[in-house]
Design a protein with these regions (language model features):
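Helical "lid/coupling" subdomains associated with nucleotide-phosphate turnover
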Residues: 1-19, 34-36, 42-185
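Active-site-adjacent helix-turn-beta-strand microarchitecture at beta-sheet edges
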Residues: 29
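Conserved catalytic-loop position in the HRD/HxD motif
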Residues: 24
């Protein structure tokens, strides 16, 4: 249903008519659908969702730096394999579907408010800047509730890794969710 919600947006057809990836980031895993010239090339599920990363890698006594490094290494290894198997060229676009994605966009200073299409380089730069802060400061900056606080670090690292490892020129975060897909259906 998340897919239907983004596919119903006017910009979607134009983006997937190029080389694009639609990435639905969930708690247990992510689903990546690769498009080329308007056609689906593949859809793959990977077990690197935000809750899974937290539960798998967050250990008592582990320093914050070590925790972040473990998440990054784990994600990067998975994405290197994905890239080798399924991507033969740089992507033009990545479309992210996830609740945190819109929080990241809202935290950025965009040239045109409401236009959630941004250069990947700018998006990654913002995530790097954000990740240098303490978790509490990130929560404040993004106006998040504390019930999501444990997932913010895995989310930032995951979004950054996806944007850099899949090497897209631009990122689009339409800010849709499953409820939008239900309404569209």
């Amino acid at each position: 249903l998340s897919y239907k919600s983004v596919a119903g947006q006017a910009r979607f057809e134009g983006i997937v008519s190029h080389h694009a990836a639609v990435i639905d980031v969930g708690g247990v895993g992510i689903q990546i659908t690769i498009f080329k010239d308007g056609h689906i090339v593949t859809t793959q599920h990977m077990d690197i969702g935000t809750i899974r990363l937290y539960e798998l890698l967050h250990k008592p006594g582990l320093t914050e730096k070590a925790y972040r490094n473990q998440i990054e290494e784990y994600i990067n290894k998975k994405l290197e394999v994905f890239r080798a198997l399924y991507l033969d060229a740089e992507l033009d676009y990545i479309i992210f579907m996830n609740d945190y994605g819109i929080n990241f966009i809202n935290g950025m200073e965009l040239e045109a408010k409401g236009d959630n299409l941004i250069k990947t380089e700018k998006f990654v730069k913002y995530l790097v800047k954000l990740s240098k802060n303490a978790k509490e400061d990130i929560i404040d900056e993004l106006n998040l509730t504390n019930d999501k606080s444990n997932l913010i670090i895995p989310s930032i690292i995951l979004f950054k890794a996806l944007a850099t490892k899949l090497t897209a020129k631009e990122v689009w975060i339409p800010g849709v969710n499953v409820n939008d897909g239900i309404a569209f259906d």
